[in-house]
From Swiss-Prot:
Coiled coil: none annotated. The active site is at 256, 290. It catalyses: an aldehyde + NAD(+) + H2O = a carboxylate + NADH + 2 H(+). Its EC number is 1.2.1.3. The lineage of its organism: Bacteria, Bacillati, Bacillota, Bacilli, Bacillales. The gene is aldA. It is an enzyme of class 1 (oxidoreductase). This is Putative aldehyde dehydrogenase AldA. It comes from Staphylococcus aureus (strain MW2). The keyword Oxidoreductase applies.
Length: 495
């Protein structure tokens, strides 16, 4: 299936500052391509420090009035954004597919609708938020107010460009903040098109979108003195840099980083559910998911029964044209990611690991211009293996045999990460006990990779700081002010 790219995507994009697309301070641009075909989609402006400074100052000015708008006004604007996203769902989903390489069935059913739902959700959250009053005694009262922080500086990863942007923009502006946000330089196009919705709905300067390199303009956003709150989704290595910037400027930061999550299949699991859940855990979005269930821990009693079923399931996955509704897995997002995946396959071949399924780049039937990789299953002898410890970020699943629940817990916790995990069992008490013992921010039971609004998402350990996607995330973007009132009109007698 082929579409006319210009029906969806402009040939060039400027920076979105103060409600308008504007030229950058430099004439430098970055080429944006379709990873499935190599086709050039657009050229974006390469923002410089001067552009970051301009955007932050605009956001500061807009904050003065935006922070004073009523909650009901803000809620209505968020609902309008969500409604318009859904009205343009098919167009924005196609842009996401063209730019990211993920299947159209995913962008249409998940990425864009869930982004819209986050705007609707945080509209309701801000409308129903209430402060508190504590009558300390008959003469003194403590009032707790939740106030916006100011200007939010955010950078989001390339794997879910629009959805991750919604995770940050919706609560930030719901709370009364303004935001300067930068998408990945390789996948910026959906957010740039959605800027046209912001243009229609929001006052100027509330949302500002910069494009450029993370190491340049992204770093400048996080280190700007005018930014009051940092929010980042991406690798743990870059997360350290964002945390350092937050410490240097003494501002709060929300960090959603890497993972190496364990998906535990117990001997009493429903194997039909387990096989589907395993695929959801590692093949969804081509495995380019921070919460991917990339370590499969299988009870030894069912190992020989489950593994052949997985081999068959993996071999039947339709990998191909992301625009085809029948495609189940599309292209990896770029050559760097494909090369990284291949390096782990090479490491497996040079070790005592055993490749049970896949392990190859796909180039036949017109796939040679893209970055397609087979669903891959690799048995490793133990959790100390390189493939069991390092985040691959692709459709590569390592499988480890375990003898009992405690060994599964111990292996699951033997990781520097703690973002997510899964347990498959028909005994809910057994599953809950494991879920409570595994040190991660999210555990799915009898499913995987479900990310609805209303359920907190975030990690332990090196997987990050803070939680997103639920009502408590609003507090990430607020200051708490206490007003203490003494009505006694009496001297305290200390001086």
């Amino acid at each position: 299936m082929a579409v006319n790219v210009r029906d969806y995507i402009a040939e060039n994009y400027g920076l979105f500052i103060n409600g308008e697309f504007v030229k950058g301070s430099s004439d430098e641009t970055i080429e944006v391509t379709n990873p499935a075909t190599g086709e050039t989609l657009s050229h974006i402006t390469r923002a410089k420090d001067k552009d970051v400074d301009h955007a932050v100052k605009v956001a500061q000015e807009a904050f003065e009035s935006w922070s004073l708008t009523s909650k009901s006004e803000r809620a209505q604007m968020l609902r309008d954004i969500g409604d318009k996203l859904m009205a343009q769902k098919d167009k924005i989903a196609m842009i996401e597919t063209l730019n990211n390489g993920k299947p159209i069935r995913e962008t249409t059913a998940i990425d864009i609708p869930f982004a819209a739902r986050h705007f609707h959700y945080f509209a309701s959250v801000i409308e129903t938020e209430e402060g508190t009053v504590n009558d300390i005694d008959k003469d003194t009262m403590s009032i707790v107010r939740h106030e916006p922080i100011g200007v939010v500086g955010a950078v989001v990863a390339w794997n879910f460009p629009m959805l991750l942007a919604a995770w940050k923009i919706a609560p930030a502006i719901a709370a009364g903040n303004t935001i300067v946000i930068q998408p990945s330089s390789s996948t910026p196009l959906s957010l740039l098109e959605v800027a046209k919705i912001f243009q229609e709905v929001l006052p100027k300067g509330v949302v500002n979108i910069l494009t450029g390199k993370g190491s340049e303009s992204g770093n400048a956003i996080f280190n700007h003195d005018g930014v009051d709150k940092l929010s980042f989704t991406g690798s743990t290595d870059v997360g350290y840099q964002v945390a350092e910037a937050a410490a240097k400027h003494l501002v709060p930061a929300t960090l959603e980083l890497g993972g190496k999550s364990a998906n535990i299949i117990l001997d009493d699991a429903n194997l039909d559910l387990a096989v589907e859940g395993i695929q959801l855990g590692i093949l969804f979005n081509q495995g380019e998911v921070c919460s991917a269930g990339s370590r499969l821990l299988v009870h030894e009693k069912i190992y020989d029964q489950l593994v052949p079923r997985l081999q068959e399931a993996f071999s039947n996955i339709k990998v191909g044209d992301p625009q085809d509704e029948a495609t189940q897995m599309g292209s990896q997002t770029g050559k760097d990611q494909l090369d990284k995946i291949q390096s782990y396959i090479d490491a497996a071949k040079e070790s005592d690991a055993q490749i049970l399924a896949g392990g190859h780049r796909l180039t036949e039937n017109g796939l040679d211009k893209g970055f397609f990789f087979e669903p891959t299953l690799i048995a490793v002898p133990d959790n100390h293996h390189k493939l069991a410890q390092e985040e691959i970020f692709g459709p590569v699943l390592t499988v480890i045999k375990v003898k009992d629940d405690q060994e599964a817990i111990d292996i699951a916790n033997d990781s520097e990460y703690g973002l997510a995990g899964g347990v498959f069992s028909q005994n809910i008490t057994r599953a809950l006990n494991i879920a409570k013992a595994v040190r991660t921010g999210r555990i799915w039971i009898n499913t995987y990779n479900q990310v609805p609004e209303g359920a907190p998402f975030g990690g332990y350990k090196k997987s990050g700081i803070g939680r997103e996607t639920y009502k408590g995330a609003l507090s990430n973007y607020q200051q708490v002010k206490n007003i203490y009132i003494d009505t006694s009109n009496a001297l305290k007698g200390l001086y």
